[in-house]
Amino acid sequence: MAESVFSCIPEDVVFNIFFKLQDDPRNWARLACVCTKFSSIVRNVCCKTQCYSAIPTVISDLLPLPPSAAASASSSTAADSSLTPPGGWASLYKLAVCCPGLFHAGILLENSDFGLERELGPDQNLDPKPTTTDLALNDEEVSKPVGSGLETTSFWSLYDDLYTDTIPAPPPEDSIDDQEEEIETSEIRPGRDLPVRKRRKICRSLGSHLASGGWNLSREQGNKLLASRFRGDCLYICNWPGCIHVEEKRNYMLFRGVFKDFKRSRVWRTINDGNRSKTSGLKCAFCLCDETWDLHSSFCLRRVFGFHDDGEPVVRAYVCENGHVSGAWTALPLYT
């Protein structure tokens, strides 16, 4: 029904409306869920235009013009329309404005937990209680729980995170005070145990969400991440400190980025030639790639960052075959 109604609207009118809503990326996320026509416009026109506007330097480096196109301005315009970044314009735009979230940054992986589950609690206890709106969305197969890695591959799947970010959720049944850290206030007396500190109940966004801070990418920041032998590779990541997630044990500064010509980079050769195993259960936060590689275990990151006393690396990062990077910084240990 929606297809037949909106197909009658002239495209110039649709474009005019869409670009008046470009200040908040979540507006396009909502519109992409209306019909396939709107989804196609958002993916192929709006995202491309906004990428050229927001990160022009990155685009010019990721998509260099061929010599024939650079010869004349008229042919370069036509050449631009035929060039597409790995993963598509929608994934690049999502990378520019979205934080990968705790799950896609690898912090909640079971095989690299480093004791975090004891501090944060099991993953299933962190999920908010489903609202009526969420249940309706699940029934219509619009999306799966954010961060679960089970998102649908429908035409709006790239926007599930932003769309879910806009759904107003009523306050939970428990009071706000119950969500704060509960500490036993009884007096310490001889012969009695010390007050027990109960686990904090936290409801956090595990998946991708609208990033805080500036929506730009910098090659200088990427150079600070890679080991010295990979300095010839071009990695753009968001400016420091990225999107800050405050946790009970330590703060995580989540970042995202993209490699230029990833399949021709030295990082990819190291991963491919070394037969590095893929990270189980961790998909890309920005495109439809189902597999990622751990740059830390592949020795592609600077060794100077080191580890915390519980074995957790100070910096971790994961890359998909399209060159999209998700990761997290933490504060350096004091003993270093």
From Swiss-Prot:
Consequence when changing residue 10 to A:
Disrupts interaction with SKP1A and SKP1B
Return the GO cellular component terms, semicolon-separated. Answer: nucleus
Which pairs of positions does the record mark as disulfide bonds?
Answer: none
Question: What is a single molecular function from GO for this protein?
Answer: ubiquitin-protein transferase activity
InterPro entries in UniProt: EID1-like, F-box-like_dom_sf, F-box_dom
Q: What is its main location?
A: nucleus
Keywords carried by this UniProt record: Nucleus, Phytochrome signaling pathway, Ubl conjugation pathway
List, alphabetically, the Pfam families matched: F-box (PF00646)
**Out of the domains of life, which is the source?**
Eukaryota
The protein's job, in short, is:
Component of SCF(ASK-cullin-F-box) E3 ubiquitin ligase complexes, which may mediate the ubiquitination and subsequent proteasomal degradation of target proteins. Negative regulator of the phyA signaling pathway that shifts the responsiveness of the phyA signaling system associated with hypocotyl elongation from red to far-red wavelength.
Q: What is this protein called?
A: Phytochrome A-associated F-box protein
Which organism is the protein's source?
A: Arabidopsis thaliana
Gene field: EID1
